[in-house]
Amino acid sequence: MSTPAHRFEPPGFRIEINERELPHEALGVIIGVEITQKLNRANDFRFTVRDAPTEGRYRWIDSDLFSLGNEVRIYLGYSGESLEVVRGRVQGLLPEYTVDGLVFAVEGSDDGYELLMVESEAKVFRRKADSDIVTEVARLAGLSPRVDPTEPLYAARTKPAGTSLFRFIAGMASHNGFEVRLSGRELVFARPAREARADLALEWEREILEFHASVNTRRTVSDVIVRGWDGTAKREIVAHAATGQEWIQEQGRRPASEITRELYGDVVRVMSNRPVASAEEASRVARAELSHASDSFIRGEVEVVGNPWIRCGSCLELLGLGSRFSGKYYVEQVTHRIGPAGFTTLAEVRRNSL
């Protein structure tokens, strides 16, 4: 069994608060760091500090370093090579006073959290495509948009009252077969990386520490039919995404819709009264829904030697798992942890073919 280069290197992390690096004595009392990145959700961070009183006063829990609202940047890596993994603001302090002393956690989320995630008043966007709306929302939140273009141009799109802007654009992402995520100072609204080259290759008993997976046809379908209404022409719009028309994740594999048809015959999902403006848009929605259903086919968790280059939206090639489970997987969620046991990365992954 070969050994990954990083396994015996000490993991490193850096934390900057309000653009100033934490002093060495502050880093020395941080006993754990955890960062979670999620598709269609905000990214979160948490680090844990051990404190002790000096002359009756705690040094760190009372420090302005950890005040609510402070900007935080966390970098992870090895041997001086580190990567910025999250940038956000302190949103919570969680102290625990016990007989063993004081330990407190500092928690927060991405920049733009308040504007994007908080339920807000209704807002109307006029004469814009979905991609234009996301670009506008990103700039409102002080983020840089990284957006794939969409069609058509809508006369009006309304974000309902009581819904967050992030939930609103996540709905548009689903409609277009896109995904939305926060990546540093960027708001990403894009097609998943289908048929992409793997960003990283990871091997069982080398980088891979554990792998758990399930194959499930409970939510897969063979076909999707979308029915809408053209109010101008006064006619029904119908589109059909047939077996095998989901987006390809890996060539040479059998897609979930094909396996579903072989096992159960026609399993057709019909979506009625969808707000589609044309047959072309209805076809995109049908294919997006077929792809979404197939994405539930194989789901897994892979724990690896800590790797900050694993991100949401990455394509991982997992090796050494046998012919059935080796292959390309798409990353939906990543949790990086540094603690007494070292640096590990846990990725939730999916695959739509076997």
Please report, for each region that a protein language model flagged, where it lies by residue.
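An acidic/polar, Gly/Ser/Thr-rich interaction patch typically located in mid-to-C-terminal regions
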Residues: 35-65, 209-354
